[in-house]
Regions:
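Membrane-interface segments at or immediately adjacent to transmembrane helices
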Residues: 132-209
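A diffuse structural propensity rather than consistent per-protein peaks
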Residues: 48-62, 80-83, 178-184, 262, ...
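Short coil/turn linker and secondary-structure boundary residues
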Residues: 63-69, 180-183, 485, 507, ...
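Transmembrane and membrane-interface helices of multi-pass
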Residues: 1-167
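Solvent-exposed soluble domains appended to multi-pass membrane proteins
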Residues: 192-612
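Amphipathic, alpha-helical segments enriched in basic
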Residues: 7-17, 21, 28, 32-35, ...
Length: 612
C-alpha cells in the first residue's frame, strides 16, 4: 500500500495546481504551467536538501525571518548538501521551456478552455486527494490527528499536500496564545506534579553553592567516547573526563531535539520543556515567559552568562536569553573574529575558549555559565595543519572529517579545563559536558555501517542518538550511570544537585538520580526508547536484542499515549505562553528589559588589560 501511495500522492496536487493555469489563455496558460511546475519542483528540491542534514522537512516556522537568517549564515553547509545531479529535479521544467522557446509547441494565443472543464479538472484534483487520504487512513488510521512525525505525512500524502497541512497547523498554533487563559496551565501542572521524582538524598545538595559550568559539545555523539580510529583514541581528554572518579557519566542519555537542533537542546536543558514539533521555539516563542535555569538560580545569588563564538542574532539568542534571565551574553562581538580563527559557523573552539578567560574572571561567584562550541559542526571542515588525527576512510567526506573536528574539540576542551584547574575554578565548580544532537544523520547509514561494524538500520540509528552527559562534582563519587534519560531531564537533575527542590516547578523531565525517575525517553516525533522496548519509525523493537516486536501490547500502547500526551502538554506551554499564568513560590519573574548584551567600550579595555 505504501509504495502505491508514494506513486500516486503527487498526482492530486499536480492536477489541481496545473489546472489553475487553464484559466489563462493559450500561450499564457502554458507559461503558467511552467511557473507552477517550477514552484512545485523547487519545494520538493528545497525539502530534499533540508532533509539531507536535518532528516526532517521544512515547516512554515522555518521560514520565520530570524530562522531564515540562520539558514543564510549556514552558507557553506547548504552548498555541501547540494549534489550536481540535483539538476535532474528540474529537467521537466527545462524541457517545457525549450518546447516553448524553440516553437515545438505553439499554443493558440486566443484559445481558452471552458470554465466548466477547468472546474472539472480542479474537482478531479480534490477528489484524487480525498481518495489518497482515504487509502492512507486505511493503512495508518488518524494520520492527520495523532502523528508527530512529518515523514508519515509526506510518505502518505506527498510533499505539496504536506506543506499545505503544515501551513494549516502553523496557523492554528498562532491562535493558541491569544485564546489561552490561566485555567489552561492547571492540566499541565497536574501532569508534571504527578510524575515528579523526589531527589535522591545521596546526591541532593552535594553541589550547593558551587559554580556551574556547561560545556556544550557540538554534534558530539556518545559513540565517540572511547572510540579508536586506526588504533588511536579520537577524544582522549573527554574520555579521561568520562572516567574521572568524580564524574557521573550517563551512558543511556539521548538527545531529544527536533527541527531546532541546538536551540531545542538549550530549550530542554534550561527549561525542561521540549522544542516545538514545527520550527524552533527560540525563533517563534523567544519572547515567552520562562522559568529557566539562570532565572531560578538568580534567586539563590547566582550570576549567569553564555559564551558563544557566533553573533547574538543567531537562533534569536539575544532575545531568548533575556527572557531566560541571563545576565551576560558574550557573543562574537566580544571576540577577535579574524579570518584565520573563523570557520564554518563562527569562532574556532581553541581561540574561543582562550579569549573567554577574561570574561569568566569578570563574573561574580557563584555563577552559572554555558560555553557553546562550534568547530565540530557539519560539514566538519578543518584545515590540515589543525587536524591532529587522520580522517576515517569510509569515502563519505562528512563522516571522515567528523573524527578530525571531534579531536580538535577534544583538544580545545582540554586546554579550557587546564585553565580552570590553574585558576582554582575547577575545584569549586560543577562541570557538565553534554552533546546537543547527532553529528551524523541517518542519510550516512552506509558510512556508519563501516564505522560501527554493524548494519546501521533504523534500530541502530535510534541507539546512535545517545549523546554524552557527564557531570563532574568535586567530592562526589562518580561512575557510570546506566539509567535511561534525555535532555529533558537535565534541569531537575542539576537543581537537585544544587539543593533546589523542583517540586513546584513546571518541568517535563525528572531527576536522573532519583529512585522515582521513570526511564522513558520520548523523541520529538512521538517515538520513544525505554530499557525494555522502543518505538522507532512506527515499529516496536525489543530494546535489548534489537529484534522487531510484531504485536503491540496494552502496555506499549499506554506508553505511546503517555509520550503523545507529554509532548502535547509541553507544546501547549510554549504555544499558549502558559507560564505567564503561573509563578512558583520563591521564584521572581524574569524582567527581560533589565538585560543589555551590547558590548561596551569598558569590556574591550578590561580584556586588553587582562591579556597583556
Amino acid at each position: 500500500m505504501q509504495q502505491f501511495l508514494l506513486i500516486i500522492n503527487p498526482l492530486s496536487t499536480a492536477v489541481f495546481f496545473m489546472g489553475l493555469a487553464l484559466f489563462a489563455k493559450g500561450r499564457r496558460s502554458f507559461i503558467w504551467i511552467i511557473v507552477i511546475d517550477f514552484l512545485l519542483t523547487f519545494v520538493l528540491f528545497a525539502n530534499m536538501v533540508y532533509y539531507r542534514f536535518f532528516s526532517d522537512f521544512i515547516t512554515l516556522p522555518n521560514l520565520n525571518p530570524k530562522q531564515m537568517q540562520n539558514m543564510g549564515d549556514m552558507g557553506g553547509s547548504i552548498l555541501a548538501l547540494i549534489h550536481w545531479t540535483d539538476i535532474l529535479f528540474f529537467a521537466d521544467v527545462l524541457i517545457l521551456i525549450a518546447l516553448l522557446v524553440f516553437g515545438i509547441i505553439r499554443p493558440n494565443k486566443e484559445s481558452r478552455i471552458r470554465a466548466r472543464k477547468v472546474v472539472g479538472v480542479l474537482t478531479l484534483g480534490v477528489a484524487m486527494f480525498f481518495a489518497n487520504l482515504g487509502l492512507a487512513e486505511i493503512d495508518r488510521p488518524q494520520l492527520l490527528t495523532r502523528t508527530f512525525d512529518r515523514n508519515y505525512i509526506v510518505k502518505y500524502l506527498g510533499m505539496t499536500n504536506y506543506q499545505i497541512y503544515d501551513a494549516v497547523k502553523s496557523t492554528e498554533s498562532q491562535t493558541q496564545k491569544a485564546l489561552a487563559d490561566s485555567s489552561d496551565v492547571n492540566e499541565v501542572l497536574n501532569y508534571t506534579k504527578s510524575k515528579y521524582a523526589a531527589p535522591n538524598p545521596e546526591y541532593f545538595g552535594k553541589a550547593k553553592g558551587k559554580n556551574v559550568i556547561y560545556i556544550h559539545l557540538e554534534s558530539f555523539q556518545q559513540f565517540l567516547i572511547n572510540y579508536k580510529l586506526n588504533g588511536e583514541e579520537v577524544t582522549p581528554f573527554i574520555n579521561s573526563f568520562f572516567k574521572d572518579q568524580n564524574t557521573l557519566a550517563f551512558t543511556n542519555f539521548f538527545h531529544q531535539t527536533g527541527q531546532g537542533k541546538t536551540a531545542d537542546a538549550e530549550m530542554m536543558l534550561e527549561n525542561s520543556l521540549y522544542g516545538l514539533s514545527q520550527g524552533s521555539a527560540f525563533t517563534t516563542k523567544g519572547s515567552n515567559t520562562f522559568q529557566s535555569a539562570p532565572g531560578i538560580l538568580a534567586n539563590y545569588g547566582y550570576d549567569s552568562a553564555v559564551f558563544h563564538g557566533n553573533y547574538k542574532s543567531f537562533w534569536n539568542r539575544d532575545e531568548v536569553y533575556k527572557h531566560f534571565g541571563y545576565n551576560h551574553f558574550f557573543d562574537a562581538s566580544y571576540y577577535d573574529m579574524n579570518d584565520n580563527d573563523v570557520s564554518n559557523y563562527g569562532l574556532k573552539d581553541k581561540p574561543f575558549f582562550k579569549e573567554s578567560e577574561p570574561y569568566i574572571e569578570s563574573l561574580k561567584q557563584p555563577f552559572y555559565a554555558k560555553f557553546i562550541t562550534l568547530t565540530n559542526h557539519f560539514p566538519y571542515p578543518i584545515d590540515s595543519d589543525e587536524a591532529s588525527i587522520a580522517p576515517a576512510t569510509t569515502g563519505d567526506s562528512s563522516v571522515d572529517t567528523y573524527f578530525q573536528t571531534a579531536r580538535y574539540l577534544d583538544e580545545s576542551v582540554k586546554s579550557f579545563v587546564t585553565y580552570l584547574k590553574e585558576t582554582g575554578l575547577y575545584d569549586n565548580s560543577v562541570i557538565v559536558m553534554y552533546g546537543d544532537h547527532y553529528g551524523i544523520s541517518d542519510n550516512h547509514a552506509s558510512a556508519m555501517t563501516k564505522i560501527l561494524g554493524k548494519d546501521y538500520n533504523a534500530y541502530e540509528n535510534a541507539q546512535a542518538q545517545r549523546v554524552p552527559f557527564m557531570v563532574h562534582v568535586p567530592g562526589v563519587k562518580g561512575g557510570v550511570k546506566t539509567q535511561y534519560g534525555g535532555e529533558i531531564d537535565v534541569l531537575p537533575t542539576m537543581l537537585h544537585l544544587l539543593g533546589i527542590d523542583t517540586k513546584n516547578y513546571l518541568q517535563m523531565g525528572t531527576d536522573l538520580l532519583s529512585k522515582d525517575h521513570k526511564q522513558l525517553v520520548p523523541f520529538r516525533n512521538g517515538d520513544f526508547i525505554s530499557p525494555t522496548y522502543s518505538l522507532i519509525g512506527g515499529k516496536y523493537y525489543n530494546q535489548t536484542t534489537g529484534e522487531p516486536v510484531e504485536k503491540e501490547t496494552k502496555e506499549m500502547e499506554a506508553t505511546k499515549d503517555t509520550v503523545s500526551k507529554e509532548l502535547q502538554l509541553s507544546d501547549s506551554v510554549l504555544q499558549g505562553d502558559l507560564l505567564r499564568f503561573y509563578t512558583p513560590e520563591g521564584f521572581k519573574k524574569v524582567d527581560p528589559s533589565k538585560y543589555n548584551y551590547n558590548k561596551k567600550k569598558s569590556d574591550s579595555e578590561d580584556t586588553t588589560e587582562t591579556t597583556k
